[in-house]
Amino acid sequence: MPITVNKLRHDTHHFFYKKIGAIFFISIFATFMNILIDMFIKPDMHIVSIMENNKFINASSLLEFIQNMNLNEKHELLKYSILKIMESLISKTTLLGSIIILISFVSEPKKKSIVSSIRTFFLFFPSLFILNFLTTFIIQIGFMLLIIPGILLSIILSLSPIILFFKKNRLLDSIRLSMYISWKYIKIIGPGVLFWMCGKFILTMLLAHFSLINKNVLFLISNISMNILFSILIIYLFRFYMIFLRS
């Protein structure tokens, strides 16, 4: 079966509208999990206010800002940064794992029970979390160097969670296979990832202009919208990999 962008777009659109309720629920659940973890972090409010009130133009301005901090502020900033990274990874892994399990549950001819699917999710979660950490770290290094390497790494590593789920491979094998397949089919996978990135940028720009809306409400709308957008990308990539395995 030939793999085309139009075919994947049609299948993604069909699945999204067929399971829109479940996707919304998962997106909202991941957002509230994010909020719940944020409540437990309880950071130093002085550090949070400093981070929110300072606009860092580039890495050098951030480094200069950190150098001017005292030792206690540096310690609090490091702790806050680590906790925020963990919060983001847990939320992303929950969303990613839930959508993958949902697509798998719907796609399988022999239906699993909901209990079995939940069990699969919890077994899959630890390895997916570590994979997310590794791929996020690699992609961020790419973005620190230049924009293009970051985008390219985002594309070629995008299949790794789905390969990990299907093949039950080791983490590095999933990354290696993702790089090989994604590079080979970059003209098909690339548009999906770029659509997601552009969508994130447009949403961020649009929501930044709603200054009259309460900050917490805006955060909620932003997170749910971003999660739905990411879910669409996962559906697109999952469908690609299903067709790829059959071809």
Swiss-Prot record:
Q: How does it sit in the membrane?
A: Multi-pass membrane protein
Q: Where in the cell is it found?
A: Cell membrane
Q: Which UniProt keywords apply?
A: Cell membrane, Membrane, Transmembrane, Transmembrane helix
Q: Tell me yes or no: is Transcription regulation among this UniProt entry's keywords.
A: no
Check the record and name the Pfam families matching this protein. UPF0259
- Got a GO cellular component term for this one? plasma membrane
Where does this protein have coiled-coil stretches? Answer: none
Q: Which residues cross the membrane?
A: 20-40, 85-105, 114-134, 137-157, 188-208, 218-238
Major subcellular site: membrane
- InterPro entries, per database record: UPF0259
UniProt family annotation: Belongs to the UPF0259 family.
This protein's name: UPF0259 membrane protein BUAPTUC7_273
